Amino acid sequence: MFPIASRRILLNASVLPLRLCNRNFTTTRISYNVIQDLYLRELKDTKLAPSTLQDAEGNVKPWNPPQKPNLPELELQGPEALKAYTEQNVETAHVAKESEEGESEPIEEDWLVLDDAEETKESH
């Protein structure tokens, strides 16, 4: 019994390195797509007629450059209108009181008025 067991051990030990050195290549099953193959075959077999300039004549509009823009018309055109504009009186919201001599006196007003806040002891 021992001689048979020892033979098996020796046989397995001698085959073991060969099993490790074997390299198995696995391949996947090749799947064919029949519809895709038919489509690609039809694409390869299709011959299109080359397009010419006469084909595009009915489908494309000819290019025309845009028109140059006109100058806008302004209300104040000409030197007379400019002179009339400069001679106009300036309208202001503040009407100055005229003094007895006929000259208007400038009135000085405070343009920045700050209200003094009352400080209370509670706020400190």
UniProtKB/Swiss-Prot annotation:
Residues 100-124 have a biased composition (Acidic residues). The keyword Transport applies. It is found in: Mitochondrion; Mitochondrion inner membrane. GO terms for biological process: cristae formation; mitochondrial proton-transporting ATP synthase complex assembly; proton motive force-driven ATP synthesis; proton transmembrane transport. Signal peptide: none annotated. It comes from the Eukaryota. Keywords: ATP synthesis, CF(0), Hydrogen ion transport, Ion transport, Membrane, Mitochondrion, Mitochondrion inner membrane, Transit peptide, Transport. The keyword Hydrolase does not apply. InterPro entries: ATP_synth_F0_suH. Residues 1-32 form a transit peptide. GO terms for cellular component: mitochondrial inner membrane; mitochondrion; proton-transporting ATP synthase complex. Its main location: mitochondrion. Pfam families: ATP_sub_h (PF10775). Residues 89-124 are annotated as: Disordered. Belongs to the ATPase h subunit family. F-type ATPases have 2 components, CF(1) - the catalytic core - and CF(0) - the membrane proton channel. In yeast, the dimeric form of ATP synthase consists of 17 polypeptides: alpha, beta, gamma, delta, epsilon, 4 (B), 5 (OSCP), 6 (A), 8, 9 (C), d, E (Tim11), f, g, h, i/j and k. Present with 6140 molecules/cell in log phase SD medium. PANTHER family: ATP SYNTHASE SUBUNIT H, MITOCHONDRIAL. Mitochondrial membrane ATP synthase (F(1)F(0) ATP synthase or Complex V) produces ATP from ADP in the presence of a proton gradient across the membrane which is generated by electron transport complexes of the respiratory chain. F-type ATPases consist of two structural domains, F(1) - containing the extramembraneous catalytic core and F(0) - containing the membrane proton channel, linked together by a central stalk and a peripheral stalk. During catalysis, ATP synthesis in the catalytic domain of F(1) is coupled via a rotary mechanism of the central stalk subunits to proton translocation. This is ATP synthase subunit H, mitochondrial. It comes from Saccharomyces cerevisiae (strain ATCC 204508 / S288c).
